[in-house]
Amino acid sequence: IQRIDHPGGVVRALQLTDTHLCRNAGGTLLGMDTDHSLRAVIELVKRERPAVDLLLATGDLSDGGAETAYQRLQGYLAEFDCDSFWLPGNHDERAAMEAVTAGSDCLSREIRVAGWQLLMLDSQVPGEVGGRLGEDELGFLESALVAAKSEGLHSLVCLHHHPVEVGCEWLDEQIVTDADAFFALLERFP
């Protein structure tokens, strides 16, 4: 469990997802320079919401799992004076993420801050586009929610793959395949 000191009150969390940074700066996805796109988002956040208490990077952080992409991401996120926490998406390589973030708490699965428990679930299925939580992640989620309930904490559950259809055919093909088990578990902890 990673604990973040916070004076209480409002916790300002910034979520970034699907940055798809390529192996080299200037790489493109669907014709878009992903480094440039992320830089534009960061500049917008710094202008409009400069106070950030923690940053959640929720998958597809790289487009092919290159360590160089994660190294650049680390540099970009260091512009915020706060902790950042990452989870993998289907385009990420966990081993490369671990290598780049070694010695940090970036890949913590459970974060506690100001009466909140943030849970970073791994819905990645290596080699697959779609997501699945599986017994291990669902077991972790259940244990964490039991603990949060007994300690009077609110919970925020984060994962890369969506558990509900969003009305986009190609994206809905990537839905979490065990979403029913996920929601059945969540319903036990209103």
Q: What are the roles of these predicted feature ranges?
A:
Residues A25, A57-A78, E93-C106, G131, ...:
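Metal-dependent catalytic neighborhoods of phosphoester/phosphodiester hydrolases
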Residues I1-Q2, A40, A96-R109, L141-S143:
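Alpha-helical scaffolding within the catalytic cores
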Residues V10-R23, G115-V125, L156-H160:
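Active-site-proximal beta-strand elements of phosphoester/diester hydrolases
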Residues Q15-T17, D53-D60, S84-N90, D122, ...:
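Active-site neighborhood of phospho(di)ester-bond hydrolases with catalytic His/Asp-centered motifs
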Residues V41-L54, G131-P190:
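His/acidic metal-ligating clusters that form di-metal
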Residues F80-L107, A114-L119, S123, G127, ...:
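Active-site neighborhood of divalent metal-dependent phosphoester bond hydrolases
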Residues G27-D33, G127, E169-I175:
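Short glycine-enriched, charge-decorated loop/helix-capping segments at active-site entrances
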Residues I1-R72, G152:
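N-terminal active-site segment of His-dependent metallophosphoesterases
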